[in-house]
């Protein structure tokens, strides 16, 4: 019984995320669809692609919420290239600015950071050839986390 409720929650949250983000930018619909296409094909390469697409969605979301530039200025006034982790920092910074409740923001911060780090680590290992196969469980867990976190963030920013 509980599994069915969680499954219904996931599906309704997923629909909410897709429709809301698609209304902001149609590219989200394509990116989120690509995750499903890669996820359900089941091959090791496609599971890795699903993780890469999760990363793209998070970066795209960061650009929509808090646009980042190609260059950042460090504390000494020098221009630096923005790294991909800047996307994560922009999401977290925007969350802290938007929400008054410290505990809920810290939980979201932990969730977003954990998902980002997991996707980065799995991608890095795959690129180095250390571990070429992402398991289905790892991929499904990351996708589930993505939709839950995006749903929470959308509700916060609306």
Regions found by a protein language model. Name each.
Residues 23-33, 38-158:
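Amphipathic, oligomerization/interface secondary-structure segments
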């Amino acid at each position: 019984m509980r599994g069915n409720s969680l499954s219904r929650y996931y599906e309704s949250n997923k629909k909410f995320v897709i429709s809301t983000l698609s209304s902001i930018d149609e590219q989200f619909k394509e990116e989120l669809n690509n995750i499903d296409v890669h996820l359900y094909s089941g091959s090791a390469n496609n599971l890795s692609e699903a993780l890469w697409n999760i990363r793209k969605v998070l970066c795209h979301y960061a650009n929509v919420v808090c646009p980042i530039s190609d260059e950042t200025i460090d504390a000494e006034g020098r221009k630096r290239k923005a790294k991909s982790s800047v996307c994560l920092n922009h999401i977290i910074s925007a969350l802290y600015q938007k929400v008054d409740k410290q505990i809920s923001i810290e939980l979201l911060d932990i969730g977003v950071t954990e998902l980002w780090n997991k996707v980065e680590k799995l991608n890095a290992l795959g690129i180095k050839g250390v571990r070429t196969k992402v398991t289905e469980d790892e991929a499904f867990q990351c996708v589930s986390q993505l939709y839950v976190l995006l749903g929470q963030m959308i509700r916060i920013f609306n």
